[in-house]
UniProtKB/Swiss-Prot annotation:
Keyword Amino-acid biosynthesis on entry: yes
Function: Two cysteine synthase enzymes are found. Both catalyze the same reaction. Cysteine synthase B can also use thiosulfate in place of sulfide to give cysteine thiosulfonate as a product.
Organism encoding this protein: Escherichia coli (strain K12)
Designated name of the protein: Cysteine synthase B
GO biological process: cysteine biosynthetic process; cysteine biosynthetic process from serine; cysteine biosynthetic process via S-sulfo-L-cysteine; iron-sulfur cluster assembly; L-cysteine catabolic process to pyruvate
Amino acid sequence: MSTLEQTIGNTPLVKLQRMGPDNGSEVWLKLEGNNPAGSVKDRAALSMIVEAEKRGEIKPGDVLIEATSGNTGIALAMIAALKGYRMKLLMPDNMSQERRAAMRAYGAELILVTKEQGMEGARDLALEMANRGEGKLLDQFNNPDNPYAHYTTTGPEIWQQTGGRITHFVSSMGTTGTITGVSRFMREQSKPVTIVGLQPEEGSSIPGIRRWPTEYLPGIFNASLVDEVLDIHQRDAENTMRELAVREGIFCGVSSGGAVAGALRVAKANPDAVVVAIICDRGDRYLSTGVFGEEHFSQGAGI
């Protein structure tokens, strides 16, 4: 390997050792926090910029715009720094301090909208800025280069790493790029793989997972590529996240806790299954939020 972008992808797949069910099922986790900017979004960020370059839509020195809840922004800021772009990122102001700091460390300009405006407000403002000619909107929610990254890399890696044994794929749904791309790949393989998407229960807030209003549903989402959707409670996502750290040594974020909570539900209901879930990022992006605070462990939550 000679460039940073060549280190994106080919992440490890590891088996749960202590938390898995005792019905013959296996739960495997794809550790996307091992990507250079620390999340699964490195794949989509690279794909969106490289494919736009190939089409002649952007060139180094241009201004790029994107709305993000954190991980995509960090990944885009890294790729922009690597390739010589100016990056403007829009994010709700209730996202963690670590995410803000990482984006700025890569040289990105960060524009905050209010918690009440949320991701919908960030997306609207990003579109307004692009329409005013302030830069090129990458638009991860409607950009086919997002799921294309997972169709060409994540899906094939999982198939190869499981030797084609995978029976269920479980993924959180935010932009839906990961689940859409992986599902497209799995649909083309020699055996059926059940695709399970995760969304927050009504009233739950899980960073990186959304229950989108109809008018904001990502354009890249194809409901026919998802066999089942599970609702995950914020408490279950956070408890599973903490349990992964203390019982499996896997330090990840809240959406990953939700993904594993869903994967365990699927594994328990399907004896002898081979379930693969995506660990989207690392836990160090959430330390300032208090979700790993001592009070949770002293009360036994998630243990």
